[in-house]
Design a protein with these regions (language model features):
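Class I SAM-dependent transferase core
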Residues: 1-62, 68, 98-115
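Residue-level signal for inorganic ion chemistry
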Residues: 26, 165, 202
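A short SAM/SAH-binding and catalytic strip from SAM-dependent methyltransferases
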Residues: 131-150
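Conserved SAM/SAH cofactor-binding pocket of Class I
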Residues: 53-135
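Conserved beta-strand segments of alpha/beta enzyme cores
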Residues: 89, 114-116, 160, 181-184
Length: 204
């Protein structure tokens, strides 16, 4: 938990309480449904919460804007971002319903009211548009952009697709035919875990 306040100093008391409650809730649910690698749970705040909040260091989601978390699983990056941006609506989408149920239960337990969930695939969503799409370690950029582009509103800022990814992305970016802006996450957060972690933004 201290690692969050190392980088973010202006949380409200409510946000601090919500972040503080996350680990025990995820540990409890992880014993029933595996949403986080067992070996990662001791580094929960660094590897999962702080990693997701890399997005918040570069993007300011506006009050009332709608953000889709594509392939959210148990709620990453959607749940940490929903705590960080309480006036932004986050729509968590995943094809595995039991993982979404974990995100729903945890959001309810900490009093998050700006989260909705949908058990579906992104390509099956119709008649719904979002200001931005966020995702973490879900699929190749080519597929993420193909699924996201039809769901993005036009003429809003910030907009587009934001992905958290790791490893050598040169081939993946080339094959996507996208020209994303790329941030090295270890230039944002200095912990060794973030080496070779990247954040990509494809504007709409």
């Amino acid at each position: 938990m201290d690692i969050l306040t190392k980088y973010f100093s202006d949380f409200t008391e409510t946000q601090l309480q919500q972040f503080a409650a996350l680990k025990d809730l995820y540990v409890e649910w992880n014993q029933k449904i595996n949403v986080i690698s067992r070996k990662d749970i001791d580094n929960f705040y660094e590897h999962h919460v702080l990693h997701c909040l890399a997005i918040a260091t570069q993007f300011e989601f506006k009050k009332g804007s709608e953000v889709m978390d594509l392939g959210s699983g148990g709620g990453f990056p959607g749940v940490p971002l929903a705590i960080f941006f309480p006036e932004t609506q986050f729509h968590l989408v995943d094809s595995i319903n039991k993982k979404l149920n974990v995100a729903t239960e945890i959001a309810t337990a900490i009093g998050l009211q700006n989260i909705s969930v949908q058990h579906t695939r992104a390509e099956d969503i119709k008649n719904r548009k979002f200001d931005m799409v966020v995702t973490r370690a879900v699929a190749p950029l080519k597929d993420l952009w193909r699924w996201s582009k039809p769901l993005l509103k036009k003429g809003v800022a910030p907009n587009g697709l934001v992905c958290l990814k790791g490893g050598d992305l040169a081939k993946e970016i080339f094959e996507s035919n996208c020209r994303p802006r790329v941030w090295e996450v270890d230039k944002i957060f200095t912990e060794p875990f973030f080496k070779e972690k990247f954040m990509l933004h494809v504007p709409n």
